[in-house]
């Protein structure tokens, strides 16, 4: 096994350098998907293990390919992964001009597809990769150019946050068949790169039905080696080096954000005695009828109907207040009575607002932008059982600057 870290997951210099440093004994490499990422990866890997892989993915123009071939001259173990058929022509042409023998990989579009939020990049209609027909044409072009021995890696990607290991094993088995066929056609295959997809259990549910969780752990994920071994043994193909690009699994927990709860805003409560005759003085006939319905319901029916009439009465009173026919003191008493009704039937569910020294848009924009769920825990009073429901509200003027999903 030889993993690579996809730089796109977090391009922070210190994160990438630490991964190269601590992964050196494991020959752990980097994956780049653009020219800036490639330059960053080349710079960092010059200080890493010389056997570590530099996987070059993404859209490639002549400049990108020239940079990747330069990595070869720097003694980096680069692999140029073809994601579009026309890229093979540029690789052949530029490598001959620079007198560099490249290491080439192909990204295959598998039939295996998952239906989750991140599954759109997989399957025959996926965004990236070559179809079976295109792979065969690439093999033919490399053969005609005397460079078929340069083809050494097969790459595929089922999608991020793969929901089950059964789906992954199915895709790996399909890829192993393609790998074995490429060996049969004369390519000197060495590596199977099955991309990313190792999921993170963000919400702790261990469920395969949510985009925020997976029902497996690292050990179960590693069992996919069985699918590769089964195919290779059956076809008498030498076992490949297995490579993965698990960016989310490596860096999703790399940092911790600690913030202070400045103050607490508790739900408003009505402590004054409720004067029913005072309320009734200003009510319209319809509002009075709603009140008597509420009173009759309280004596003879269940909680559900009781709350229905209470809410209907409250809305009628609010409309009167908007029209100017009900005073603010009477409206406050109506709120107090409805609050008492909720408590009486056990439906009261007060939510506290904790004002936190934080800007959601600055520190955790993914929470707002893509509804990413972040594990949040207190750092004090851990010996006490939580007893209140709450919302975390930041100190900015943005109405979306709050955390209400946990």
UniProtKB/Swiss-Prot annotation:
<keyword id="KW-0456">Lyase</keyword>
<dbReference type="InterPro" id="IPR029066">
    <property type="entry name" value="PLP-binding_barrel"/>
</dbReference>
<dbReference type="InterPro" id="IPR022653">
    <property type="entry name" value="De-COase2_pyr-phos_BS"/>
</dbReference>
<keyword id="KW-0460">Magnesium</keyword>
<dbReference type="InterPro" id="IPR009006">
    <property type="entry name" value="Ala_racemase/Decarboxylase_C"/>
</dbReference>
<protein>
    <recommendedName>
        <fullName>Arginine decarboxylase</fullName>
        <ecNumber>4.1.1.19</ecNumber>
    </recommendedName>
</protein>
<dbReference type="GO" id="GO:0008295">
    <property type="term" value="P:spermidine biosynthetic process"/>
</dbReference>
<feature type="binding site">
    <location>
        <begin position="192"/>
        <end position="202"/>
    </location>
    <ligand>
        <name>substrate</name>
    </ligand>
</feature>
<keyword id="KW-0661">Putrescine biosynthesis</keyword>
<keyword id="KW-0745">Spermidine biosynthesis</keyword>
<dbReference type="GO" id="GO:0008792">
    <property type="term" value="F:arginine decarboxylase activity"/>
</dbReference>
<feature type="modified residue" description="N6-(pyridoxal phosphate)lysine">
    <location>
        <position position="8"/>
    </location>
</feature>
<keyword id="KW-0663">Pyridoxal phosphate</keyword>
<dbReference type="GO" id="GO:0009446">
    <property type="term" value="P:putrescine biosynthetic process"/>
</dbReference>
<dbReference type="Pfam" id="PF02784">
    <property type="entry name" value="Orn_Arg_deC_N"/>
</dbReference>
<dbReference type="GO" id="GO:0006527">
    <property type="term" value="P:arginine catabolic process"/>
</dbReference>
<dbReference type="InterPro" id="IPR000183">
    <property type="entry name" value="Orn/DAP/Arg_de-COase"/>
</dbReference>
<comment type="pathway">
    <text>Amine and polyamine biosynthesis; agmatine biosynthesis; agmatine from L-arginine: step 1/1.</text>
</comment>
<dbReference type="InterPro" id="IPR022644">
    <property type="entry name" value="De-COase2_N"/>
</dbReference>
<dbReference type="InterPro" id="IPR002985">
    <property type="entry name" value="Arg_decrbxlase"/>
</dbReference>
<keyword id="KW-0210">Decarboxylase</keyword>
<comment type="similarity">
    <text>Belongs to the Orn/Lys/Arg decarboxylase class-II family. SpeA subfamily.</text>
</comment>
